[in-house]
């Protein structure tokens, strides 16, 4: 398929998939079907017995049942297949340390055994896996309600907001009180004035891919965090998973797009008009970012400001504006919005050195125990994965600045 036609089709299909109007219509249809049949509002929960996130999610089931007029069906499921979780060993290690920190933040004690009455024998796991697949997912710790999936504690606020909007809360919130949820999304503290560094300024290492929707959500916040706390910023580009030989099956891609859309709405960011940059567009983008980082080095910029501007412009173009970075005009638009001209674009595309840099960054990321993006770390503190963990990054910055203990939850 010609690249230009592919970009057009990508914009159209992604726009339809992430359309708020179509999402709201689907929700109304589910609600109408429930009312016409007189059935209960059913929340299906997929519990993976050996999953730390499932241990946390299961701990809030009694709270959800007490707060909402819903029937909860709990199904045991096996771990995701390799196509959905291609680096299982690192996923397990990351999940264990991340879930401990997440539990401390929310003040939730994880269950040490499956929910009462849940069968976890081989046949039950197989039935749960079949139901999960039929409903369109692949992970544990997943809540499914009337056509939409919500992952663990991190998306519980979206689920509860929807339940409350449907009038399913047993005790509705007072007018103007806002939505009260069991695990509110963490917020950044933005301490003012920020603490002064103890000697050397901390450095944020940011592992970035240009095909990651979640990276688009993270990059602006991360840039502002570094500036606010006076941290240096090292931008480390890596190729997307699918361009590193790691599969990304359709159910996973679909969930990521839909989840990114609702998170983008919460953060006030545009998202949904997508020109998928997989392949040559991403390679051209990384070349341009590396050229910008070389300019930063010459100019003595310790915050990677030009490289960050190019990466942010690329991500906005790919995921919010539908700009085809595979075309000369598209890449030039991206460059110009970041302050670079056509000569810089030509120089960047003539230099293939970015490939060795991206590979070195990939190996560094793996050595830190992670494989996906967005990932980041402060100095030599453990690396973090996911735009939902920016609050932990801020905690680590405060630790480096001498204002908090490691893993602080305040």
Indicate residue ranges for each PLM-predicted region.
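N-terminal leader/targeting and pre-domain segments
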Residues: 1-30, 35-37
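A short, charged/proline- and glycine-enriched loop
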Residues: 36-43, 197-204
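Structural alpha/beta surface segment adjacent to cysteine/selenocysteine redox centers
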Residues: 44, 49-50, 55-123, 216-318, ...
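C-terminal cap of thioredoxin/glutaredoxin-like
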Residues: 13-16, 54-65, 119-194, 200-205, ...
């Amino acid at each position: 398929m010609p690249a230009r036609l592919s970009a057009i089709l990508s914009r159209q299909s992604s726009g339809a998939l992430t359309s708020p109007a179509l999402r709201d219509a689907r929700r109304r249809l589910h609600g109408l079907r429930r009312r016409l049949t007189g059935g209960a509002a059913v929340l299906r929960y997929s519990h993976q017995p050996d999953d730390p996130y499932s241990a946390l999610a299961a701990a809030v089931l009694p709270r959800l049942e007490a707060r909402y007029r819903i029937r909860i069906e709990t199904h045991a499921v096996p771990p995701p297949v390799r196509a959905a979780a291609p680096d299982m060993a690192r996923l397990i290690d990351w999940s264990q340390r991340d879930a401990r920190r997440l539990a401390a933040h929310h003040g939730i004690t994880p269950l040490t055994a499956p929910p009462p009455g849940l069968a976890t024998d081989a046949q039950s796991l197989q039935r749960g896996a079949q139901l999960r697949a039929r409903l369109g997912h692949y992970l544990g710790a997943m809540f499914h309600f009337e056509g939409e999936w919500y992952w663990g504690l991190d998306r519980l606020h979206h689920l509860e907001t929807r339940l409350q909007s449907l009038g399913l809360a047993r005790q509705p919130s007072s007018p103007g009180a806002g939505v009260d949820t069991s695990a509110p999304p963490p917020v950044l503290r933005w301490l003012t004035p920020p603490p002064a560094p103890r000697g050397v300024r901390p450095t944020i290492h940011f592992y970035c891919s240009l095909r990651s929707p979640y990276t688009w959500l993270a990059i602006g916040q991360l840039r502002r965090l570094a500036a606010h706390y006076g941290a240096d910023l090292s931008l480390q580009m890596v190729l997307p998973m699918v361009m590193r030989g790691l599969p990304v099956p359709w159910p996973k891609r679909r969930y990521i797009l839909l989840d990114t859309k609702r998170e983008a709405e919460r953060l006030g960011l545009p998202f949904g008009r997508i020109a998928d940059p997989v392949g040559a567009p991403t390679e051209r983008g990384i070349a341009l970012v590396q050229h910008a980082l070389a300019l930063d080095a010459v100019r003595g910029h310790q915050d990677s400001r030009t490289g960050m501007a190019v990466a942010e412009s690329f991500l906005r173009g790919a995921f919010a504006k539908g700009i085809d970075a595979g075309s000369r005009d598209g890449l030039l638009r991206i460059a110009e919005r970041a302050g670079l001209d056509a000569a810089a674009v030509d120089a960047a595309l003539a230099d293939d050195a970015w490939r060795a840099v991206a590979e070195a960054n990939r190996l560094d990321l793996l050595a830190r125990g992670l494989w996906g993006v967005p990932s980041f770390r402060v100095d030599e503190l453990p690396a973090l994965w996911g735009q939902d963990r920016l609050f932990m990054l801020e905690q680590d910055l405060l630790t480096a600045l001498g204002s908090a203990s490691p893993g602080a939850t305040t």
